[in-house]
Design a protein with these regions (language model features):
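Short, contiguous strand/loop micro-motifs
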Residues: 12, 73, 115-116
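Hydrophobic ligand-binding cavity/cleft-lining segments
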Residues: 1-44
Length: 138
């Protein structure tokens, strides 16, 4: 498995940050690697969805669990990516640390491109966090 980590400090409460990051349908606005989302089902704090990612317009299935105002965990259940993407909110005084951890591997022949895709995911995550910060702090 490949671990990719990134974090950013946002000058806002965890509640305010949560309002942005928990809007799963708005994910492509911040996460450029996510091109399209199709929700399959939703029950309580769990969403099953199909996402289209930027890499060759590949489709992946995810089960996303929301722990309100604390954590979002997306488990890739089908597609070229296996593993998880976790977004955690950590209140620090009057600010919020947003930490993203990808724990993934690429399935099949895609494994050959792990290094290139890891760099792409890291850059995309950094860019997403910066965009989220700008949106929240507006």
């Amino acid at each position: 498995m490949t671990i990719i980590q990134s974090s950013i400090r946002i000058n806002a409460s965890a509640d305010k940050v949560w309002d942005i990051v928990s809007d799963l349908d708005n994910e492509p606005k911040f996460w450029k690697g996510t091109k399209e989302i199709k929700n399959i089902s939703k029950e309580e704090n769990k969403v099953t969805r199909e996402i289209t990612i930027a890499f060759k317009d590949s489709k992946c299935m995810q089960e996303v669990t929301l722990e309100p105002k604390r954590k979002i965990q997306a488990v890739f259940t089908k597609g070229i990516i296996e593993g998880t993407k976790t977004i955690e909110l950590i209140p620090v005084e009057n600010t919020t640390e947003v930490e993203v951890i990808w724990d993934i591997k690429l399935s099949g022949l895609m494994g050959m491109f792990t290094g290139m895709i890891k760099k792409h995911i890291k850059n995309g995550t950094d860019q997403a966090l910066e965009s989220i910060k700008q949106e929240v702090e507006r």
